[in-house]
Amino acid sequence: MELKLTRPICFFDLETTGIDVARDRIVEISIFKVYPNGNKESKTWLVNPTIPIPPQTTAVHGITDEKVANEPTFKELASQIHNMIKDSDLAGFNSDRFDIPL
């Protein structure tokens, strides 16, 4: 399948501390960016959620409190993430109900 892009598109996915968009926090952000000329780039950031990651959640994605203890917070990463996605269309699975509200 060939994409006919007029601007970049960023496919993104989040791993979190749980599924409550009002309470839970991001622990990992992955972005895969495709440019109209076909070039691609990807980046994954580990994020310190500043709250404990429940063991049942770690069992799903494998990210532990220890793994993110020395990572930047979302606030500290926000400008890097913005720079990667600005001027791009966004795409993700279930993103309208979970990832974007979070």
Where are these regions (language model features)?
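Conserved non-catalytic scaffold segment of RNase H-like nuclease domains
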Residues: 1-102
